[in-house]
Amino acid sequence: MPKFVVVTGGVMSGLGKGVVAASVGRILRARGLSVTAVKIDPYLNVDAGTMNPYQHGEVFVTFDGGETDLDLGHYERFLDVELPHRNNITSGQIYKSVIEKERRGDYLGQTVQLIPHVTDEIKRRLVEAAGGFDVAIVEIGGTVGDYEQLPFLEAVRQLRLELGGDVLFVHVAWVPILKTTGEFKTKPLQHSVAELRRYGIQPDAVVVRSERPIDANAVKKISLFAHVPQHAIFNSYDVDTIYKVPLLLERQGMGDFLVERLRLRGRSPDYGEWESFVARLSAPSRKIAVGMCGKYVELPDAYLSIVEALRHAGAALDVRPELVWINSVEVEKNPDLLPKAGVDAMVVLPGFGKRGTEGMIECVRYARTEKIPFLGICFGMQLAVVEFARNVLGLRDANSTELDPQTPHPVVHLAPEQESVDVLGGSMILGNREVEIVPGTLAAALYKASLTVERHRHRFEVNLAYVPKLQEAGLVVSGWRRDVKRVEIIELPAHPYFIATQFHPEFKSRPTRPRPLFLGLLSAAVEQSRR
């Protein structure tokens, strides 16, 4: 039977509970243990696919096509695993499943209630997700005291009752510091633990989030009022990169605590590659300004995996990518913003809908004509095709039918399999697809392979009817879907580095295994800057 580490949060949201959960997993992975991770989101949405990026941040796409919470991205990057969509559990999924079972008659006439039917469904899914692993990390989203959390807290309380010492509770809470006196105030944390105990859960360990390291007096107070031994109180204070958090907690003894408390057999921890990555990340020899052009740039979390993929590539190249966020809506109003941005490379980001797209197209044009290394991702590739069709091929009204259904030159249009789709949720082209790479191209040089498997999330595609004309004008299609004829990668050989993809390369980037397209972008930017 696998062990469970359940991570809860208190005092306020946005503490980095997901990073702590991922760090716990990294600590156990460093000991050679097999680890998976589950994120519980108490909202009633079935998944994150239709949620506003400003509310939810990035939608992380799993290999099997799940549209999930961005914390699954943290888990995959820290644990170096690929997680299935079932590892993101929402209230919407739970209630939908219970109601469907009731309609089928699975409950044999019982009165269906939160306890036991909803809590049993939650436990069933947790045990299913944990199957075959030594340890499952379970993060419960939200803050203790939220109404939406109650069924999940009750379910993990029951899980502890049933499995005993195979379930360990870690509570993450904020301890502010009063700047006028320099005193750490532990009362909010004490109250959040008291609230957790009201639901029958006593934390086994506490992770204190704080701006700077807490003092011994604060540890004593937390131990006394939270009823947690001092050796089980850990401090995740602010650091310059989230990738230092596992090392920080390891130095405080969390690894030994987890192994002893859960009765695990693990080897001596090995952080060799991880420490090397963190060292390179923290002390690069040069900086590169990377323009990030998109429509949701006020909330960088909307592009979290792309940001992390650039950091991974930067660490490998001894370069720090300094991100310059470019609001495409503002570019529409004032294209002169682009020369003033002073970027060494340009990424045109994913997105949906008409707002701000002309500004994104202008970012493509600027990068193409000024010979700035360029990477377009998903929507960014589609808009790169639109820009090329307008300004090189001479089709002035070229567009995507997503943006202008009546365009006379639909160089991007709805994928055929999407024409009969009548629901938004979970209906896009999602998850892993095989991409064949054309020999002799930039893509082939970057990937050093003839085939790659990449994750997708889109409805629209390049219109094959226009591909011959685009190619005649100098655009090269360097990647095709293997199972259907679909453009996956485009590039411009006459440009120092201009490449764009229909797929999302960022979702498979790992700290010690950066993806080729991001390495290529930063390498080209470094080479350009030397000139």
From Swiss-Prot:
Keywords noted in UniProt: ATP-binding, Glutamine amidotransferase, Ligase, Magnesium, Metal-binding, Nucleotide-binding, Pyrimidine biosynthesis
InterPro entries named in the record: Class_I_gatase-like, CTP_synthase, CTP_synthase_N, GATASE, GATase1_CTP_Synthase, P-loop_NTPase
The enzyme's E.C. designation: 6.3.4.2
Binding locations of Mg(2+): 71, 139
Annotated binding of ATP, by residue: 14-19, 71
Annotated residues for binding of CTP: 13, 146-148, 185-190, 221
Alphabetized Pfam families for the sequence: CTP_synth_N (PF06418), GATase (PF00117)
Residues noted as binding UTP in the record, renumbered to the chain: 13, 185-190, 221
Biological function: Catalyzes the ATP-dependent amination of UTP to CTP with either L-glutamine or ammonia as the source of nitrogen. Regulates intracellular CTP levels through interactions with the four ribonucleotide triphosphates.
Anything else known: CTPSs have evolved a hybrid strategy for distinguishing between UTP and CTP. The overlapping regions of the product feedback inhibitory and substrate sites recognize a common feature in both compounds, the triphosphate moiety. To differentiate isosteric substrate and product pyrimidine rings, an additional pocket far from the expected kinase/ligase catalytic site, specifically recognizes the cytosine and ribose portions of the product inhibitor.
HAMAP family recorded: PyrG
Name of the protein in question: CTP synthase
Source organism per UniProt: Pyrobaculum calidifontis (strain DSM 21063 / JCM 11548 / VA1)
Source taxonomy: Archaea, Thermoproteota, Thermoprotei, Thermoproteales, Thermoproteaceae
